[in-house]
Amino acid sequence: MNTVLKILMAGVDEVGRGPLAGAVVTAAVILKKPIDGLTDSKKLSPKQRNLLAIRIKEEALAFAYGRAEVEEIDQLNIHHATLLAMRRAVEALPIQPDNVFVDGAFTPQLNIPCKAIVQGDSLIPEISAASILAKVLRDEEMVALDKIYPGYGFAEHKGYATPVHKEALMRLGPCKIHRRSYSPVADLISK
């Protein structure tokens, strides 16, 4: 009897550390087999990301999302909130991985061996897949939030500190999904 032991590896990445508004969203992905076209989500067009996200969801052995809400970001800081969201994504996987690879320089606290890989979203297919899923989900959320909080342009800039967003922030003031701990939101509140 020939038994092959397959090590299950999860890739984890985040989207939304830098924006002035919205949650930080993470994904964890365990792939069954390689998927052509996987790379860092920032190197793909929205159309390419959306098509790959469909394939990842169909072909991955498992995937899950994690998040840290604006209140958690403001309370913990973005670094700790991101690690919390990463842990939530891994813990939400329906299958427990043997190893976890995380994009970046830091790893969340897990009861599984975990390694941080700088630029992992360009190097490790599982991290690339996680990058794509997290980006597509967060972008969809920001488009939906644009309808709830009109005037800020969330559908276009996804909460990042663009000139249009800063101008809207000055004109309208912060809304519920703005990160109070982030400048220029904090600067505006303190005036």
Curated annotation (Swiss-Prot):
UniProt xrefs under SUPFAM superfamilies: Ribonuclease H-like
Record GO cellular component, one term: ribonuclease H2 complex
Domain of life: Bacteria
GO annotation terms (biological process): DNA replication, removal of RNA primer; mismatch repair
Keyword DNA repair: no
Disulfide bond residue pairs: none
Cofactors demanded by this protein: Mn(2+); Mg(2+)
Record key words, sorted: Cytoplasm, Endonuclease, Hydrolase, Manganese, Metal-binding, Nuclease
Record field: catalytic activity: Endonucleolytic cleavage to 5'-phosphomonoester
Primary location: cytoplasm
Residues the entry annotates as binding a divalent metal cation: 13-14, 103
Cross-referenced NCBIfam families: PRK00015.1-3, PRK00015.1-4
Role summary: Endonuclease that specifically degrades the RNA of RNA-DNA hybrids.
Protein name: Ribonuclease HII
Taxonomic placement: Bacteria, Pseudomonadati, Pseudomonadota, Gammaproteobacteria, Legionellales
Gene for this chain: rnhB
